[in-house]
Each structure stands twice: as C-alpha cells, then as structure tokens.
Amino acid sequence: MVGPYSLSYRGGEMSELLTTVDGRPLKEALANAERSKRIRAVLLVLPLFVFIFFSFLYPIALMLYRSVENPLIAEHMVETVAILENWDVKEVPSEEAFAALANDLVAARKTREIGKIATRLNFETPGLRSVITGTGRKAARWGPPFKEQFIAYRSEWGELETWATLKRLSPTITTVNYLAAVDRKLNVEGNVVQIDENYQIYVDLFMRTAWMSILVTLACVILGFPIAYMLASLPLRQSNMLMILVLLPFWTSLLVRTTSWIVLLQTQGVLNDLMVWVGIINDAQRIQLIFNAQGTVIAMTQILLPFMVLPLYSVMKTIPPSYLRAAESLGAHRFLAFWRVYVPNTLPGVGAGCLLVFILAIGYYITPALVGGQDGQMISNMIAFHMQKSLNWGLAAALGGLLLLGVVLLYWVYNKLVGIDRLQMG
C-alpha cells in the first residue's frame, strides 16, 4: 500500500484500487457514509411523518372505515342474524326467527344495548326505534309461540320491510350509508331504489354546495385578479403596505368576520339603512341579504378572497413588465397585449387560487351555519348535524367520504387538463 490507495493486478492487467486509511475499499466507505446521511435525514423528518399520519392520514382512514362498518347488529343479535342468512325475503320468517329475535331482544335489554340497536335500525327505516324498544320490554314476558304475539303487539313485525331491514344490516361491512348519502336504499328484494321523495335531501345539498362553491370561486377571481395586479404593479413599499390589508382578515377571528356581515346585511342593518337614506328603496322594500344563499356567497367570498389574491400576486410578480411593453411596441393595443400576453402567464396562479378557494368552499361549515339560514346550508352543515345531533356517524362519514372523493376527482381533472406541474402557490 502506498498512502491511501494500493495497486493490484487482475487478469494480467494492473488496476488501481482506492482504499481508506484503515484499508477498506473507498466505494464501500462512501456507501456507508451515504447510508448514514440518509438515516439521519429520515430521523429528522420522522416527527413530521408521525404528525401527518396521526393528524391527517389516520383520521381520513378512520372516517372511511366508519362509513362502511356495521358491527352492532351482528354482535348483539347473533341468533337472528344466523336465521336470516337463509331467509328468502319472499314471506315473513318462520316461528324460529321470531323466537331468535325474542332471545336477542331480551339479552340486548339486559346488557343495555337495545337502545343502540333501535337507533341503528331507525336510521335505516324510520319508526323502528319504538318498535324495537317496545318489543324488547314485552318479549321478556312472552313464551312460545312468539310469531302471533309479535305481530299482535306491533303490525310492523308482519311486514317484509322490517325483516329486510334486519337482514340488510346484518353484515359487519355495508354500503347502506353511501346509498343513503345519495338518496338511495335497498328495497325488500335487494335492489337499489330511490328513497321517499320527502326524504331526498342529500343530492340537492351536494348540488347546492357545488354551485355555491363555484359562485364563490368566480367572485374571488373577479375581485382578486385586479387586486393582485395592482399589488404586483405598484412599487414594493406601497404594495407591502396594501398587502397588510389583504392579510388583515387572517389576523381577525373567523367568528367576528362572519357576524359582522350579519350586522351589515340584515334588513335593519347598515346597508339597508344606507339604501333607504339615499332613496334607492323605501322602508317597506328593505332587502333580505342575510340568512339565505346570497348571504352565504357574500360572506364566503370575503373570507376566501385572500386565498385567491396571494397565489395570483406571487405569480404576477414573476412576469416581467417588458412583456407588455414589447407587445405594445409591436403594434398591439394595450388591452390586447394584456389579454394575449399577460393573462396567459397568470394562469398557473389563477388555477392555484381557484383550486384552493373551491376546495375550501365546499367544506366550509361555520359561515353557512351562521349566515346561511335554510337556503344557504351546505353539505358540511348536514355532516355536522349527523355528528352532533342525530349521532348517525356512519352517514356523516359517508357524506364526508363523497366530499373527499369530489376533491380527489377535481384534483385529477385539473391535472389532466392543466397539469399539476403548472400549479404555483408562490
């Protein structure tokens, strides 16, 4: 060995083998060093991965699982589920099924699970809660034969729909929540049909949510583009001062910003008082601008406007002013130069802003809840209702899953039409 490397002969030819001071091949030493660097890099970002997993990936996975899980009936009505596996759904089950149901209801009442069972069945077929709880109290005093006593007590036990509901909810994994989320259900024969017209609300809510989110996005583009253009065109000192006004809403509570619109837009509010004072309308013609869809769109536009301005501004700052001057020097009208040269260069910012605003808008909850009234409610409000009041978490998770699917599809369409590589936030 001479110094840090040695010479060796292989196949009759002399080759130079580089080694470290301690005699290890240099290639192996470099590989070990690179491996150590990669391990240290992974350890540095490991807390971030853990945070993303527990705060983002795990909750989404849990929500999706909650939307299809259905263990309650299978766990607490074991005998009934076993009998109904072979039921042909053409006629009311035999005495054996009624006896199994009586045993399961008595056992569920002793374990205090009958209320949960009744609530779950009532979600699927309204009215079954009272049937289950009432029958559970009576069944403990009944003896064979059970079939006549069940039907005599509540006629629902003689209907195929009641037993079909029990059979539909027997599997531990089910899609009934997703069917309910699109106003569908399984009938007695197991076919997918529309639910009663009086209960069809979710498809309309999804359509309203999409339409209002599109309106908010368009309003943000129309208002945000001139603001971003002005900020990008002004000298740095002045644009920084005006940027504070754009960022000011982020420093104000969302609740304060939303309730301020109630003060401004209500029938006895500032805007109506001003129009009456100017003479645009008289006192009897005051306009209802809040607690409806219009109020929701106005309030959400103001709240989400910064999310449109900031991506536009960051892209516009990178467009050289010489582009417009060059187009005008070649004979183009100022507006034509702006439209044909400047605007196409801002499309990455427009796409980023639209994507961001639309995704935020379809999932907004507090603003529609405060200013939406009945006409301005969105699908997020119905998700909150099922989470907090009706406690139908499976349906709430299914509605959230469909909303997530819509966002993923929107992202996919944007990638196909525009290209996600052109998405610029700054």
Predicted regions and their residues:
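Membrane-topology segments of multi-pass transport proteins
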Residues: 1-43, 62, 66-203
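Transmembrane-helix boundary motif in ABC transporter permease subunits
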Residues: 27-29, 33, 62, 215-247, ...
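Membrane-interfacial helix termini and adjacent extracytoplasmic/periplasmic loops
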Residues: 27-34, 257-301, 371-374
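Interhelical loop and adjacent transmembrane-helix boundary motif
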Residues: 37, 76-79, 83, 369, ...
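Loop-to-helix entry region at the N-terminal start of transmembrane alpha-helices
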Residues: 43-44, 201-212, 276-307, 354
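Transmembrane alpha-helices
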Residues: 47-50, 302, 307-313, 320, ...
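Transmembrane alpha-helix signature in integral membrane proteins
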Residues: 199-230, 343
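C-terminal transmembrane helix and the adjacent membrane-cytosol boundary/short C-terminal tail
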Residues: 313-324, 328, 397-426
